[in-house]
Regions:
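Beta-strand-connecting loop/turn residues
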Residues: 12-13, 55
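Generic, low-specificity signal for short hydrophobic/alpha-helical stretches with a mild N-terminal bias
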Residues: 12, 32, 70-74
Length: 99
């Protein structure tokens, strides 16, 4: 598993793996990616928007959770957002530091 890979969780929702590749705890810290069309406007740097499979998705950074790694290994990653690490880390900074 690689940090900033997008996986399809059971039930079909997309999640972004936020955890470093350097530790293996049997679980992974993830945040949901929600279709931009299904909710309120994204909140600035806290909720960056990414295009995945041709559609806009909002990263719900403040709703992070740890899930068993096995939930993410049932299929290949849907997308690789490692090229957006600046935006993702910025969103995490907002959650943990407030700026």
């Amino acid at each position: 598993m690689a940090q900033f890979q997008v996986y399809r969780a059971p039930g079909g929702r997309l999640v972004l793996d936020l955890q470093t590749d350097l530790i293996d705890t049997g679980s992974r810290v993830v945040a949901s990616l929600v279709p931009a069309s299904s909710g309120p406007k994204a909140i600035g740097r806290l909720e960056p928007v990414f295009t995945i499979e041709g559609a806009a998705y909002v990263l719900h950074t403040a709703e992070m959770a740890a899930v068993p790694s096995a939930l993410l290994t049932q299929g290949a990653p849907v997308a690789d957002l490692s090229g957006s690490d600046y935006e993702i880390r910025g969103a995490l900074d907002i959650v943990f530091s407030g700026f």
